[in-house]
Amino acid sequence: MATASFDSAPGASRALPAIEKAPEVTALSTLPGRKASLVGLTREGLKQALIGIGVPERETRMRVSQVWHWIYVRGAREFSEMTNVGKGLKAQLADHFTLERPEVVTEQVSRDGTRKWLLRMAPTGAHDHNRGAEIECVYIPGDDRGTLCVSSQVGCTLTCSFCHTGTQRLVRNLSTAEIVAQLVVARDALGDFTGQMPGKDGGEPGRLVTNIVFMGMGEPLYNLDAVIDAIAVMSDQEGLALSRRRITVSTSGVVPQMERLGLEANAMLAISLHAVRDELRDELVPLNRKYPIAQLLDACRNYPGLSNARRITFEYVMLKGVNDSDADARALVRLLKGIPAKINLIPFNPWPGSKYECSDWERIERFSEIVFTAGYASPVRTPRGRDILAACGQLKSETEKLRARARLMLEEGMGAEAVYADQVD
């Protein structure tokens, strides 16, 4: 049975976790001599790109609208497809820019239809070793929706003990364009742009991607500027056209940024709670040492737009013998009193090296029953994509996995030649 080891005994001083500053990239960051892609830019970013190649400012509103439509409604891959854009401007655009998406390094499809893409971003400089940072995003098809789980950072700084991504060091923040491009890649793969041929999922009527959750790699509120701008692009009704009520941002509890998220993004909020006592949450979610449960829930009660129609989702991973007792369930109900909320119970998804086990199904059902009886919706999240490590808490970029394997080979006495052969095999 997995148990938590506490590093904050009652009465002891609460050490604050060091929060690593993530390197930034700008919207058009790229290596010298490499054309930047326009895919993922905001309206303002696209305007500045056009002005930069000589488009008169008086024409930019019309030109931005034209190019915007081709990128975000039609899913254009070449400027030559833009039939209502003049030949001269198309030539200028092609001389200076591309419509490239991030490279799809691998695509894995689970037995349940979940898809995971490993994406390599365009190289931007020394902080990604001129190779291009890699992230993962996941598409989860459902009966009445299709949810895309997107990443906001390369790696993560929070080191949550039950989360695979937390074992990968933080490399850098993703730009707005890199966040939006994950949705563009998904729509490409699914044939989900207007006028495209049906994708691998059969081209069902309506949009295949209906919901976005910022629950991939990284802490979104530590990259809030880019996340807010990405939500604006995703929800623009003349483009990707998602409803903001179908966009959910999950945070481990960066309390000072929560109000701004609600005011500027108007997105749905999810909280990675996972414990009802500070001493346990300090271990599971070390950020709790900086923003303990009382502060976090106070920020939730004051979240802009909070109502019964816009409830906060509290995520609670079920860990056997750690946080799954009847007493924990009753304490959870008491903590959330007065907050319009639902509680997502998440069966723990195992990953190599984890010290935890998933609660027994009977225990999960009992926990859910207690919460539901108290008046809170308490669905048990169906694990999706476990067989391809695409489920909640399992994402970790392939680059980091390969580096870890290389270190292990060297520690076992295998030479550099063997490591190189393994990496390129």
UniProtKB/Swiss-Prot annotation:
Belongs to the radical SAM superfamily. RlmN family. Binds 1 [4Fe-4S] cluster. The cluster is coordinated with 3 cysteines and an exchangeable S-adenosyl-L-methionine. Reaction proceeds by a ping-pong mechanism involving intermediate methylation of a conserved cysteine residue. Keywords: 4Fe-4S, Cytoplasm, Disulfide bond, Iron, Iron-sulfur, Metal-binding, Methyltransferase, rRNA processing, S-adenosyl-L-methionine, Transferase, tRNA processing. Pfam families: Radical_SAM (PF04055), RlmN_N (PF21016). S-adenosyl-L-methionine binds at G218, E219, S250, S272, L273, H274, N349. One of its GO terms (molecular function) is 4 iron, 4 sulfur cluster binding. Its EC number is 2.1.1.192. It comes from Methylorubrum extorquens (strain PA1). Its main location: cytoplasm. Its cofactor is [4Fe-4S] cluster. The active site is at E136 (proton acceptor), C392 (s-methylcysteine intermediate). This is Dual-specificity RNA methyltransferase RlmN. Residues 142-381 form the Radical SAM core domain. One of its GO terms (cellular component) is cytoplasm. [4Fe-4S] cluster binds at C156, C160, C163. The keyword Amino-acid biosynthesis does not apply. InterPro entries: Aldolase_TIM (IPR013785), Elp3/MiaA/NifB-like_rSAM (IPR006638), Methyltransferase_A (IPR040072), RlmN_N (IPR048641), RNA_MTrfase_RlmN (IPR027492), rRNA_lsu_MTrfase_RlmN/Cfr (IPR004383), rSAM (IPR007197). The lineage of its organism: Bacteria, Pseudomonadati, Pseudomonadota, Alphaproteobacteria, Hyphomicrobiales. GO terms for biological process: rRNA base methylation; tRNA methylation. It comes from the Bacteria. It is an enzyme of class 2 (transferase). The gene is rlmN. Specifically methylates position 2 of adenine 2503 in 23S rRNA and position 2 of adenine 37 in tRNAs. m2A2503 modification seems to play a crucial role in the proofreading step occurring at the peptidyl transferase center and thus would serve to optimize ribosomal fidelity. It catalyses: adenosine(2503) in 23S rRNA + 2 reduced [2Fe-2S]-[ferredoxin] + 2 S-adenosyl-L-methionine = 2-methyladenosine(2503) in 23S rRNA + 5'-deoxyadenosine + L-methionine + 2 oxidized [2Fe-2S]-[ferredoxin] + S-adenosyl-L-homocysteine; adenosine(37) in tRNA + 2 reduced [2Fe-2S]-[ferredoxin] + 2 S-adenosyl-L-methionine = 2-methyladenosine(37) in tRNA + 5'-deoxyadenosine + L-methionine + 2 oxidized [2Fe-2S]-[ferredoxin] + S-adenosyl-L-homocysteine. It is found in: Cytoplasm. Disulfide bonds join C149-C392.
